[in-house]
Amino acid sequence: MISDKIKLTAKDILEKEFKTGMRGYQQEEVDKFLDMIIKDYEAFHKEFEQLKQQNARLKRELEEQKLAATQVPQQPVVQTPVAQPVYNNTNTDILKRLSNLEKAVFGSKLYE
């Protein structure tokens, strides 16, 4: 985990003492810089904790969704019948129409 890789805490940075020499760093400048680092470090730590909580929450929600999905009863897929042409009625209608047309065109000559 990332927590194992972090070696310093904000408190460690705050309490760090630097040795000063005759021509060493200006102590005030180092303190100001360390204060900025501490603030950033605390902000990163806070963000990290929030992300860990969010990650745990999302994992729980995912597990709940998986569990709910397995518990949903499987409903059979109902296929709607495809409209099939009705040949019997169509053929009968065509034959009747043809007969009527023949009677109209040829009259009674056809049936004599």
Swiss-Prot record:
- A cellular component term (GO) from this record? cytoplasm
Q: Does the keyword Cell membrane apply?
A: no
Coiled-coil ranges (or none): 38-72
Protein family according to the UniProt entry = Belongs to the GpsB family.
Protein purpose: Divisome component that associates with the complex late in its assembly, after the Z-ring is formed, and is dependent on DivIC and PBP2B for its recruitment to the divisome. Together with EzrA, is a key component of the system that regulates PBP1 localization during cell cycle progression. Its main role could be the removal of PBP1 from the cell pole after pole maturation is completed. Also contributes to the recruitment of PBP1 to the division complex. Not essential for septum formation.
* Description of how the protein assembles with itself and partners: Forms polymers through the coiled coil domains. Interacts with PBP1, MreC and EzrA.
Q: What name does this protein carry?
A: Cell cycle protein GpsB
Organism whose genome encodes this protein: Bacillus anthracis
